[in-house]
Amino acid sequence: MTRATKIVATLGPASNTPEVLERMIRAGVDVVRLNFSHGKAQDHIDRATMVRAVAEKVGKSVAIMADLQGPKIRVGKFENGRIELVPGTPFILDADRTELGNQDIASLDYKELPRDVKPGDTLLLNDGLLVLTVEAVRGAQVHTVVKLGGELSNNKGINKQGGGLTAPALTGKDMEDIKTAMSFQCEYLAVSFPKNATDMEMARQLANVAGEPYRHKPAMIAKIERYEAIPHLEAILKASDGIMVARGDLAVEVGNAAVPALQKRMIKMARELDKVAITATQMMESMIVNPVPTRAEVSDVANAVLDGTDAVMLSAETAAGKFPIETVEQMAAIALEAERAEFVSLDTDFAGRQFGRIDQSIAMGALFTAYHLGCKAILALTESGSTALWMSRHRIQVPIYALTTQPISQRKMALYRNVRPLLMPKFDDRDVALAAAEKILVERGALMPGDTYAITCGEPMGYPGGTNMLKVCRVN
């Protein structure tokens, strides 16, 4: 049994060499995340070049995800680099201040905060480790009282409990970073803090314009991090190609206890709308410093797999941790074990579904046929990857091999659950193409003489969205 759930790993100082990256890819990485919150444009271009070269060396399809920083709202710097907030003491956030902060006051990089808050609001600093209660707003100053204290250092983030900050989803920096990401033709572009579908539509338009010189359009991932995004989940998903359950900032805004149920809801909705889902944040956090995960982390990864997520993501664990390779190995092993335990059946929400497209109906027909016949594999000849995406929405333990003539489609499909993307030559004749596809799978050891498999393709060949044929074959 091969692993169906994909692994997204973030590059950083701990994994920024071809040697380490190669071992991570061999250990199970399917998508490499470039975090645009850190580093310069050339750093990301160099890393993308490295990813392409190492993936080619390993002989594996690896996608690149460019993750935009978004409107991070932060305090400024302090005279001594940090202060200690004491519960019950006053503390001022000053949007006009240009001097370094001290024990009583701090500057802000977000000038609209005084307009966005009111007395009684709760502000959370440093990912919720520090809590302030707003007492008053006087001009550009937000006067607060420390509710939960601790150390506050330079440039730590600020969230408002329950949402309500009006910062736009796309900043000037993001717009420049989109141009950089398009220059190396990332397969996925992740947008931070979208509030609604309009934010995603704007990001897609900017990406498509920036990608025009390269004839490239990335798939768009919406990072669900804001309280305001929750009522608009369906619209955001429909305007995107997938979502990231970004549990860090989301938990700060909605509360830790609300996140597990939201995670399940988002993954289920993504599958129903034929979108991909990535589960992220602190999945193997202890492995930043420890060689093995905690039992709680093992359960967290396994439960995300059982929820039906397409991918589980590593952030600081592979970017800055001591054990990047071991973390990937552990995550791959956990995912595989969870998949063995899955109760596999044809989901009723898909079984009773009607389809308005021939290619989508063929994709679903292949799944049902393979499931009931006990086929060894499903082969999908696809130009754009849509057929493989539809197949991957259904949890089934029959492996899906997606064969395409398009390298960009091959890499994009690296994120799809239970899909093994392969590159094949272009054929105009359908029967020649079908025979070539079988030969590729036999040579890889995925099919043996006597095995049955379901195969889909379109006729005429080579047209995206043209899948109109399903055939069951036996290997001679």
Report the location of each language-model feature.
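Non-catalytic helical/linker scaffolds that mediate oligomerization, partner binding
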Residues: 1-476
